[in-house]
């Protein structure tokens, strides 16, 4: 198998010139990052090809050496992707594993690749490229989740359900309106992703260790070759910066919080006590002892992964909070946090998209529950303001008395007699019963962004044009 570790010197071949002996085994273990940063192999090779091409263009290395380097790097890419590459912990990281293998393939020309470059700007480039690509994947995944909610919202724009505050029945809404609330939430997540891509669209390569380089490089050329808008403007900040990683983790934490809230509602709604939805077999599990069980494990695991993603954000914030400018080895701890959060977020979005698409909405159960808990009480208060001319606070008090009477009688507001209501306030007429149904309540909420089916369809159309 191809091996990036054929060098037998006691000290590392890339930086061992001033060392008389190699590192202790414990030092080698704590120092090595190849176990996780090998995930950056494609970005590292892509960056090195762009760098070598620029060096040749500027006459810093020969065209012949550039061609050898590019061919060797392409060979290494094939070896890694086919599983034929042996990663060596002794070589610390992905950069030196690739460079060592390149040297074994093409000889001395490999040593010219690192001209005008440091691992400090190299890793900043690799990691930034990876995060940028992950953000693009996240944007696509969120678009799919938004699309799933738009489909359900369109299907249920007029399906009445109870709206809750404090998890207590509040006012009737439509399931379509509730779905559109999640569209707004995940739409904001997607906007944050897009803004983050703009923020990080600058190429670090060429900043070198921290001071730039005396070689006549063209950083604009490499930036363009790597798909960046422009190069970074300050070499010290370039190698100091992990804002792009922190911003990714912040976005991931907020999105995961939204996913967790959705997961919580799915768990609640799927219980027999609520019965608002029926989960598909594809996103449920059973019990090893209770044959009747159908557990919402996917939703529960998404809810749990939120804590894991939040933990990654806090971990990296803590790593970065006390560092002086330029590179410190502490920053090696950035990647595992981002890689783990990215994997968790990607899986969580996919799981929730599947659950939303496949779940069965039980409109009959939703409608039956919508009228419980005196959910049209606000409609009575509003009617008293409009038709009887009461100030809202007085109408609120009158309605509260009506609710108390209904509780005493064990009935709904709509089941009180006109005489009952007029005993509380004689201005009430029989027209009040027109507003005490859940359908009338929902239909009346025609304010911009409201739950009336016509308004929900406007919200859906607005988002369809942008998804």
Swiss-Prot record:
User: Which keywords are on file for this protein?
Assistant: Amino-acid biosynthesis, Arginine biosynthesis, Cytoplasm, Lyase
What's the Enzyme Commission number for this chain?
4.3.2.1
According to UniProt, this protein's pathway is: Amino-acid biosynthesis; L-arginine biosynthesis; L-arginine from L-ornithine and carbamoyl phosphate: step 3/3
Specify the protein name. Answer: Argininosuccinate lyase
Reaction(s) the record says it catalyses:
2-(N(omega)-L-arginino)succinate = fumarate + L-arginine
Q: Mind naming one GO cellular-component term on file for this protein?
A: cytosol
Family named by the database record: Belongs to the lyase 1 family. Argininosuccinate lyase subfamily.
Q: Name one GO molecular function term.
A: argininosuccinate lyase activity
Major site of localization recorded for this protein: cytoplasm
* UniProt subcellular location: Cytoplasm
Q: Name one GO biological process term.
A: L-arginine biosynthetic process
């Amino acid at each position: 198998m191809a091996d990036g570790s054929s060098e037998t010197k006691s000290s590392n071949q890339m930086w061992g010139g001033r060392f008389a002996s190699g590192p202790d085994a414990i030092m080698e273990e704590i120092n090595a990052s190849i176990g996780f940063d090998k995930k950056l192999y494609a970005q590292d090779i892509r960056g090195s090809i762009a760098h070598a091409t620029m060096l040749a263009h500027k006459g810093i290395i020969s065209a012949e050496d550039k061609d050898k380097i590019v061919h060797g790097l392409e060979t290494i890419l094939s070896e890694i992707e086919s599983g034929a590459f042996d990663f060596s912990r002794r070589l610390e990281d992905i950069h030196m594993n690739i460079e060592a293998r390149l040297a074994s393939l093409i000889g001395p020309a490999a040593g010219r690749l690192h001209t005008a470059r440091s691992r400090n700007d190299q890793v900043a480039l690799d990691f930034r490229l990876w995060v940028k690509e992950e953000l693009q994947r996240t944007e696509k995944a969120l678009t799919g989740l938004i699309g799933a909610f738009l489909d359900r919202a369109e299907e249920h724009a007029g399906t009445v359900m109870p709206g809750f505050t404090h998890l207590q029945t509040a006012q009737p809404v439509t399931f379509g309106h509730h779905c559109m609330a999640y569209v707004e939430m995940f739409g904001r997540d997607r906007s944050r992703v897009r803004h983050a891509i703009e923020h990080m669209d600058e190429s670090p390569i060429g900043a070198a260790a921290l001071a730039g380089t005396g070689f006549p490089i063209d950083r604009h050329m490499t930036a363009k070759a790597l798909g960046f808008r422009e190069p970074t403007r300050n070499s010290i900040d370039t190698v100091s910066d992990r804002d792009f990683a922190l911003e990714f983790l912040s976005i991931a934490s907020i999105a995961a919080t939204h996913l967790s809230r959705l997961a919580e509602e799915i768990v609640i709604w799927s219980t027999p006590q609520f019965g608002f939805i029926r989960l598909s077999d594809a996103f449920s599990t059973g019990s090893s002892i209770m044959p009747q069980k159908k557990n919402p494990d996917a939703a529960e695991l998404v809810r749990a992964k939120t804590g894991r993603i939040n933990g990654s954000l806090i971990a990296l914030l803590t790593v970065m909070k006390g560092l002086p400018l330029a590179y410190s080895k502490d920053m090696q701890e950035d990647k595992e946090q981002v890689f783990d959060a990215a994997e968790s977020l990607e899986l969580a979005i996919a799981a929730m998209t599947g659950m939303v698409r496949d779940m069965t909405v039980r409109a009959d159960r939703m409608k039956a529950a919508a009228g419980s808990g005196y959910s049209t009480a606000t409609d009575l208060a509003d009617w008293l303001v409009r038709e009887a001319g009461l100030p809202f606070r007085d109408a609120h008090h009158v309605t509260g008395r009506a609710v108390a009477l209904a509780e005493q009688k064990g009935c709904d507001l709509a089941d009180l007699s006109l005489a009952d209501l007029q005993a509380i306030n004689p201005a009430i007429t029989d027209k009040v019963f027109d507003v005490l149904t859940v359908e009338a309540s929902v239909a009346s909420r025609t304010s911009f962004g409201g739950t009336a089916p016509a308004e929900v369809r406007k919200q859906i159309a607005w988002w369809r044009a942008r998804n």
